[in-house]
Amino acid sequence: MENKAILETERLILRPWNIDDTPFLFKYASDPDVGPRAGWPPHNSLEESRQLIETIFNNDTTWAMVLKDVGEPVGCIGYLRHNNANIPIGEEEAEVGYWVGRPFWNNGLCSEALSCLVEYCFNTMGIKCLWGDCFTDNPSSARVMTKCGFTNCHIERKCESLIVGKDKPVMLFKLENKNNIIMNELIACCGLNCEKCDARMATINNDEELRKKTAKFWGELNNCEISPD
């Protein structure tokens, strides 16, 4: 089990779903224009929403998107590990997914939530690469990912595991953990790959710290100068 976290942004609190959220989930997930865009059918009853909270949403990688101004869940965000992702990915990678109720479309909430999730996945969970996908006729979802730094892989494929739209192509997007990229490049360049290196590099949590520590660390080991700029 992964450590379940409560995350917070300027306008949102990302927290676990609970049974009391059932009416809010049903209110937005029953909209026929919401679920099919993300590959799942509209909810047909409060009982269906309740069961999904108790089963599908009852894990350590799914969060309710609670809008602070209204104090209720207005959407959902999370990630899937390689063993249950909709697309083939590596063991140290994950697939992100998100949706928000129609009254809150075009307000930047999904981008705000995804940006927070990316930081959590990379800096706390140590995930090396994040993948995202959306139907080719859903440019709004594509914009969310590109706004958060994801790159369009220009690859289209079908996701047989989807409940709705398994016969439709999806576009793939990718975002690599910068800390991991630079660490691997430095190790490959200098030919060093030891426990000491891994322990020192594992303390890096952001780009500025990364530049400073790599410059100092690798300069010490190799008697050379590496500019932090």
Each model region followed by its residue ranges:
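Short, surface-exposed helix-loop/turn micro-motifs enriched in polar/charged residues
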Residues: 40-41, 88, 186
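Conserved GNAT-fold acetyl-CoA-binding loop/helix
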Residues: 33-54
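Acyl-donor (CoA/ACP) binding surface of acyl/acetyltransferases
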Residues: 1-33, 66-182
